[in-house]
Amino acid sequence: MAMKGYLDEYEKLVIRMNTPRVVIDNGVCSSATIVKVDSSRRNGILLEAVQILTDLNLSIKKAYISSDGTWNMDVFHVTDLNGNKLNDQSVLRYIEQSIETVYYGENIEVNGLTALELTGTDRIGLLSEMFAVLSDLNCDVVDAKLWTHNGRVASVIYLKDCISGAPILDSHRISKIEGRLKNVLNGDNDVNSAAKTCVTVDSMMHIERRLHQLMFEDRDYERRSKKHERSPMVVVTVQNWAERGYSVVNVHCRDRTKLLFDVVCTLTDMEYAVFHATINTAEDQAHLEFYIRHKDGSPISSEAERQRVIQCLEAAVERRALEGVRLELRHPDKQGLLAEVTRTFRENGLNVTRTEISTSSDMATNIFYVTDANGDEPDFKLIESVREKIGLECLRVKEMPTMYHKKGDGEEQQQTKAVLVSLGSLVWRNLFNFGLIKSCS
């Protein structure tokens, strides 16, 4: 009996030691909320923390990540999309509780839905054809996300039966859905399309992480578009620091929401461990620096591997780049709604480059990023014509909130210095000793 009590206390101690400690500070910095995370080191812990922050549509203005090999210390400077500090206590509690529970590594469960994964060759009208097939097969699209990049498309769609509202479990019906969608993705006998479909009713991982994985598996990073060759959206460099046994990765690009998630997600899925990192934003620009190793502790070992890391990180940033006009559709949900809307896009020469579909309480809230056939921003008159056909009150042109930055962050720099001094830990001294932080800005 005494042994059982001892084991219970030991188990509690292990859980307490491995559970991340979160401190949220709204007083030290006037322009951002500081989120500090202390945790024992394990694979994926950084990605999970960043994922929680980005899923709340928070902007990470600055971040400092450091590890002594067994312990992590991460500090994030976050705001909402309008550049305001976080004052909603329910949001602050959610952040704290969510990060503290990632130790248990639970998968995302989608109750009562069937998950559909698709990859193939992108073309104008593809989304319209996909939704037309699903409508014809009495599939109700509840949630979905679709990305396009370098001529490829990846999508994760959650379905239920239109009539019963239940998940689709019948193997014959699932096979029919997969077959018809694969025909759509293949197009006119395109032997190079390499279309893939997969239907599952199991719990799924984070949908945006899965989209990155689908694009990576499809090797979209090898098909750099002429548009990106002319005007690179992101500059990535990789160098080895032989003395310390690190590979140093620098990413410079335009700042946007979820940027840090996209980069850390890709590094994690490529099985690199981030030991130290600094993230800084100024105006609309972002600079990210990572000190990484393989899981076995070795740095990048060849020129081919170095080039692959560069290509994959460029692709990770470009996949979510804001291209085209953002249209938001809010409409009572009904069977065939998505097929009707996307058919109107196709008939008017609009190409959908990215999509986010969600349904709540019988109301559909959908986001479409559209371009013309050449990948350029569509003419305003064309957009208004499409809105009139779908419904001016239902379909609106929506601008993303401007990323909030101050030109002179002198006050914040002083406050950041105070944060670093107050931490006073060996881990933070390592950041300076290793030369990972040249200044506190």
UniProtKB/Swiss-Prot annotation:
**What intrachain disulfides are recorded?**
none
InterPro entries named in the record: ACR1-12 (IPR040217), ACT-like_dom_sf (IPR045865), ACT_dom (IPR002912)
Annotated signal sequence range: none
One of the GO BP terms on file: response to abscisic acid
List each copy of the ACT domain by range.
Answer: 34-110, 115-196, 248-324, 326-405
- Which branch of life, at top level? Eukaryota
Tissue expression, as annotated, is: Expressed in roots, leaves, flowers and siliques.
Could you tell me the keywords of this UniProt record?
Repeat
Q: Does the keyword Repeat apply?
A: yes
Sample GO molecular function, one term: amino acid binding
Which Pfam family, an example, fits this chain? Answer: ACT_ACR9_3rd
According to the record, what induces this protein's expression? By abscisic acid (ABA), and cold and salt stresses.
What does the protein in this record do? Answer: May bind amino acids.
Q: What is this protein called?
A: ACT domain-containing protein ACR8
Q: Which organism is it from?
A: Arabidopsis thaliana
Q: Which gene encodes it?
A: ACR8
